Amino acid sequence: MSYMAKKCGVRFQPPAIILVYEDKEAGKSRQRIMPIRNFSKYSDCSRAAEQLKNNPRHKDYLDLVSLRQLEKLYKLLKGHLKGESLKVTLEEIKKEETIDPEEDLNKLDDKELAKRKHVMDELFEKNRKKKDDPDFEYEIEVDFTKDEQAESCGWDDASDEGF
């Protein structure tokens, strides 16, 4: 059977992941409600998302839904279970997905560092120019002219006397 995922969302009460999909064989739009059991505010969102995606009962339906999107939905549910507002939870998710250029990555633990590297890799792949892109150029030549006078540094001037 082939299914085309259209929308994916979360229901807070009772907790469930809701998928709106199109059944390609029948040509009809349908809705699938996948209940979330044994999930608390202390649960690991990435692990729960993996378990749902690999569940044989839902696997065919969630094939086109990314694991990252399922993790976000679980984080929204986790924030709701903690008593946080939707706005606060969305801000936390956005903060996790953006890279602060001033942040010292040496101070992060291994798990957080792996998350940051994953976000950077995704951002790199998104912005990377591929051969098939219309504005792709194979060789870019840059001319560094020597018309401008090179600026000298203060420490260069002091060491010139010794030579």
From Swiss-Prot:
Keywords, comma-separated and alphabetical: Cell projection, Cilium, Cilium biogenesis/degradation, Cytoplasm, Cytoskeleton
CC annotations in GO: centriole; ciliary basal body; cytoplasm; spindle pole
InterPro entries: CEP19 (IPR029412)
Subcellular location: Cytoplasm, Cytoskeleton, Microtubule organizing center, Centrosome, Centriole; Cytoplasm, Cytoskeleton, Spindle pole; Cytoplasm, Cytoskeleton, Cilium basal body
Coiled coil residues, start to end: none
Tagged with keyword Cytoplasm: yes
One matching Pfam family: CEP19
One GO term (biological process): cilium assembly
Keyword Nucleus appears in the UniProt entry: no
Family: Belongs to the CEP19 family.
Function: Required for ciliation. Recruits the RABL2B GTPase to the ciliary base to initiate ciliation.
PANTHER family (alphabetical): CENTROSOMAL PROTEIN OF 19 KDA, CENTROSOMAL PROTEIN OF 19K CEP19
Protein name as catalogued: Centrosomal protein of 19 kDa
